[in-house]
């Protein structure tokens, strides 16, 4: 007889990451093409000398540096093993059986899985024009709503909500409901569409901003992210945190990235330029795609997404399908983008 497991896990799917195929071009996981800067690499190598010791579980130095970086006091900062772990902690401190967690859909695939794992109910509000429909989300709030996720830019559709609309939305949400603005891709926003998310934290004690070092800072393999929120929320997060999950190496790398933030963020300009080029080429080829404010583009190939991804894989290009809703394609190095565009222009399903 095997150990008895929670019955609700039986139909809960596991999170499926982007595939990796040896020898193929992988543009499925929104990774940066750039390796660490020499200064970041040096910090990593130095930290390796101390990996026989436990990391600083309070992240004192990193929290102080992050606080200075975002212009808050350290007690407004929480660090996690990637922002995805902070998503789980935020669900844990707000929601349990009978509670509801609200978000637009399609969005970050981990949200419904983490909500169901906590025993709560995910409430998925359909997107409008591939973007969070904030009015519809307000209408979906019930007396059981405990938490709202706003993924901005949205993963996988690449879109952002209007900054003023986001501010009005936060103002309209009842203050006992937590609003989490998940900004994993915020460094790629242009065109004046970046919200004053930290201003929302200062004005509303129920707002949390999540950011990560995995994307623009290039530390996806080291797993480190952070939350900015009211100190009461930060204190609650510490009660459900799994100790020592952000390693000494990842902390050292994050601090070095903050030291080199200007240089690292300059790299995003090259990504944005490629995003513009790739988007224009796809539209010229006949694809319909929303304007991207992330390091990826979204192809809403309804009913054809799996075939597109399979055919791309046969051409040694790995993209990320989302059911039959569409395909997410990471903006990569120019030669990798060219390989993808070569496939996309000649894809039989486009005819």
Curated annotation (Swiss-Prot):
Named cofactor requirement(s): pyridoxal 5'-phosphate
| Keywords, alphabetical | Aminotransferase, Pyridoxal phosphate, Transferase
Q: Which InterPro entries match?
A: Aminotrans_II_pyridoxalP_BS, Aminotransferase_I/II_large, ArAT, HisP_aminotrans, HistidinolP_aminotransfase, PyrdxlP-dep_Trfase, PyrdxlP-dep_Trfase_major, PyrdxlP-dep_Trfase_small
Citing just one GO molecular function, the answer is: pyridoxal phosphate binding
Catalysed reactions, semicolon-separated: an aromatic L-alpha-amino acid + 2-oxoglutarate = an aromatic oxo-acid + L-glutamate
- Lipid metabolism: present as a keyword of the record? no
Q: What is its EC number?
A: 2.6.1.57
Q: One GO BP annotation here?
A: L-histidine biosynthetic process
Tell me yes or no: is Transferase among this UniProt entry's keywords. yes
Q: Which family does it belong to?
A: Belongs to the class-II pyridoxal-phosphate-dependent aminotransferase family.
Q: What is this protein called?
A: Aromatic amino acid aminotransferase
Organism per entry: Mycolicibacterium vanbaalenii (strain DSM 7251 / JCM 13017 / BCRC 16820 / KCTC 9966 / NRRL B-24157 / PYR-1) (Mycobacterium vanbaalenii)
Name of the coding gene: pat
């Amino acid at each position: 007889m095997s150990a008895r497991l929670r019955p609700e896990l039986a139909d809960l799917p596991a999170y499926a990451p982007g595939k990796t195929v040896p020898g193929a071009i992988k543009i499925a996981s929104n990774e940066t093409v750039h390796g660490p800067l020499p200064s970041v690499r040096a910090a990593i190598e130095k930290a390796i000398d101390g990996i026989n010791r436990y990391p600083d579980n309070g992240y004192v130095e990193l929290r102080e540096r992050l606080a200075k970086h975002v212009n808050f006091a350290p007690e407004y900062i929480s660090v996690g093993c990637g922002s995805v772990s902070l998503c789980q902690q935020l669900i844990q401190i707000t929601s349990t059986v009978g509670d509801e967690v609200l978000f637009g859909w399609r969005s970050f695939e981990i949200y419904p899985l983490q909500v169901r794992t906590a025993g709560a109910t995910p409430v998925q509000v359909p997107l409008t024009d591939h973007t969070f429909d904030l009015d519809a989300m307000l209408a979906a709030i019930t007396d059981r709503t405990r938490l709202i996720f706003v993924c901005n830019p949205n993963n996988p559709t690449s879109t952002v909500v209007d900054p003023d609309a986001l501010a009005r939305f936060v103002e309209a949400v009842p203050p006992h409901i937590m609003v989490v603005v998940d900004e994993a891709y915020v460094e790629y926003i242009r065109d004046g569409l970046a919200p004053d998310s930290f201003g929302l934290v200062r004005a509303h004690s129920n707002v949390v901003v999540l950011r990560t070092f995995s994307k623009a800072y290039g530390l996806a393999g080291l797993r480190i992210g952070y939350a900015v929120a009211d100190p009461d929320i930060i204190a609650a997060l510490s009660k459900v945190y799994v100790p020592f999950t952000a390693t000494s190496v990842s902390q050292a790398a994050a601090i070095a990235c903050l030291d080199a933030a200007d240089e690292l963020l300059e790299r995003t300009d090259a990504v944005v330029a490629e995003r513009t080029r790739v988007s224009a080429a796809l539209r010229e080829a006949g694809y319909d795609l929303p304007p991207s404010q992330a390091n990826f583009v979204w192809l809403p190939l309804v009913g054809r997404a799996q075939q597109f991804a399979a055919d791309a894989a046969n051409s040694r290009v790995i993209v990320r399908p989302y059911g039959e809703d569409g395909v997410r394609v990471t903006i990569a190095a120019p030669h990798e983008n060219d390989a993808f565009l070569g496939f996309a222009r000649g894809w039989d399903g486009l005819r």
